[in-house]
Amino acid sequence: MAIGLEHYLTVAAILFTLGIFGIFLNRKNVIVILMSIELMLLAVNINLVAFSTHLGDLAGQVFALFVLTVAAAEAAIGLAILVVFFRNRGSIAVEDINMMKG
């Protein structure tokens, strides 16, 4: 039995749904929200690679590499901001971040 396109799409849909549930069910911790967003980006990348392979076009795979690069940079910058915020405020709760004043 070969693994077809529908298997990849099913896995990607499950990962995307888990990411959405992670955002909606845990609104108190910023790190969990960032991890859920990364899980959703991973699901999108799986879709890009699956469709790219199915259609025989490399554009989707190249675009997935760019998305992974940007997602890694976004995660690094987001975590660095959270570390600085935790050092200054002592908490990374979403309520505390919403109270920031410019």
From Swiss-Prot:
Compartment(s) of residence: Cell inner membrane
Protein name stated in the entry: NADH-quinone oxidoreductase subunit K
Main location: membrane
GO process terms (BP): ATP synthesis coupled electron transport
Subunit structure: NDH-1 is composed of 14 different subunits. Subunits NuoA, H, J, K, L, M, N constitute the membrane sector of the complex.
Transmembrane segments: 5-25, 31-51, 66-86
Function: NDH-1 shuttles electrons from NADH, via FMN and iron-sulfur (Fe-S) centers, to quinones in the respiratory chain. The immediate electron acceptor for the enzyme in this species is believed to be ubiquinone. Couples the redox reaction to proton translocation (for every two electrons transferred, four hydrogen ions are translocated across the cytoplasmic membrane), and thus conserves the redox energy in a proton gradient.
Pfam hit, one: Oxidored_q2
Coiled-coil residue windows: none
InterPro entries membership: NADH_UbQ_OxRdtase_chain4L/K (IPR001133), NUOK/Mnh_C1-like (IPR039428)
GO molecular function: NADH:ubiquinone reductase (non-electrogenic) activity; quinone binding
EC number(s) from the headed UniProt entry: 7.1.1.-
Catalytic activity: a quinone + NADH + 5 H(+)(in) = a quinol + NAD(+) + 4 H(+)(out)
Leader sequence segment: none
GO cellular component: NADH dehydrogenase complex; plasma membrane
Membership in a protein family: Belongs to the complex I subunit 4L family.
Keywords: Cell inner membrane, Cell membrane, Membrane, NAD, Quinone, Translocase, Transmembrane, Transmembrane helix, Transport, Ubiquinone
Membrane-related topology note: Multi-pass membrane protein
